């Protein structure tokens, strides 16, 4: 593990405890690598929150971090509204990963999620597909895979509708 990878884990750990790291100043190159790695793993807001007090404010990283957290908050709002509409329609998918995992973080919207995952039975897929298309969610033409992606028009909300939890063809499961 590289020194920057170790610092990433240290910053994430501090963030989860609501603390800041206390490091000697890192070089601009090291900070860039740290923030890049955090961005790749979708934890930039968490890492930046723990790091900026000891390393100084980086306006560009701060803006990216804040934008990511705000976008996540809007996606969460859109998702919760969609779930409410599903419940009104007597549709009750199992929510897995995403919003559930974010509840483990002190500030859930700082843990960016690329998508929300819903698990349904294969038999109910046509019902959910119809509901989604009637509620401004779009997808591609291939509806056969074990998971079908949907994007809410005008939103960053991206949903993967799973017909099974794992790929049946996968040798890992």
What is each stretch, according to the model?
Residues 1-114, 120-173:
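Conserved NTP-donor binding/palm subdomain of two-metal-ion nucleotidyltransferases/polymerases, i.e.
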